[in-house]
Every structure is written in C-alpha cells, then in structure tokens.
Amino acid sequence: MRWSCHPMSSVTSRLRSATADTFALVVYCFFTGMAIEILLSGMSLQQSLSSRVLAIPVNVIIAWPFGQYRDAVVSLASRHGPKQFWTRNLADLLAMSVFNHRSMRRFFLRWGWSGGSCSRRWSAMR
C-alpha cells in the first residue's frame, strides 16, 4: 500500500503543516519583534523579552490561518508573476503585512485600544 492511499496521510500532512507554520511564525515573530522593539523602539532587553513571551499565545493562535493565507498569496504571485526569488519574497512580505495588520487591529480593538491613545503617546515621544 502506498502512503498517499492511507486514510490518515492527509490528516497527518495537515497536522505536520500546521505545526511547521506555528513553529516558523512563533520563531520569526519572536526574533524580528525583539529586534524592532530593542533597535527601533528603544525597549530594554527585559521589556522586549517580556513582550515577546506574552506575544507567543497570539502567534500560536494566528499561525495556521496565516500559513494558509501566505501559501495562497505566494502561489498566486508565482502563477501570475515572474518566477524569480524576489517575486516570492515580495509576496511573502505582502502576505505578512496584510495579514498581521488585520489580525492585530482586531486584537487591539477587542482589548480596548483606541487610536487617540496611540497618537498621544507617539506625539509625546517626539
């Protein structure tokens, strides 16, 4: 019997894909978020570590839907654009930016964020 005919192979494949998406997003967001927080925002190492640890559950929740969305965007870009390295990277960047913007907006609105408080804080930092 071939593995592809096994009834559990698609379940196993989806589970493996979801696990890979989750691990990749958590690790990527941990290190890039930490770099942004320390280098651009001026947070201390302790503040950044605390922030990154608190962000892990959110990243775990959005990892599988993001993986599906990213695969669709990259596939669409490779079908309709030149098959070059930069096309895939730009599609990956676009998928990350669009997906994260929408998911973080929902998260912040759910927990009571307001644009006014953010703009006041930004003005005070200048």
Curated annotation (Swiss-Prot):
Bilayer-crossing regions: 23-43
Keywords: Amino-acid transport, Cell inner membrane, Cell membrane, Membrane, Transmembrane, Transmembrane helix, Transport
An example Gene Ontology molecular-function term: L-amino acid efflux transmembrane transporter activity
Main subcellular location of this protein, as a coarse class: membrane
Protein topology in the membrane: Single-pass membrane protein
GO cellular component, as recorded: plasma membrane
Subcellular location as annotated: Cell inner membrane
One GO biological process term: amino acid export across plasma membrane
Highest taxon listed in the record's lineage: Bacteria
One Pfam family recorded for the sequence: AlaE
Assigned protein family: Belongs to the AlaE exporter family.
HAMAP family linked: L_Ala_exporter (MF_00914)
Biological role stated in the UniProt entry: Exports L-alanine.
Name by which UniProt lists this protein: L-alanine exporter AlaE
Gene, per the UniProt record: alaE
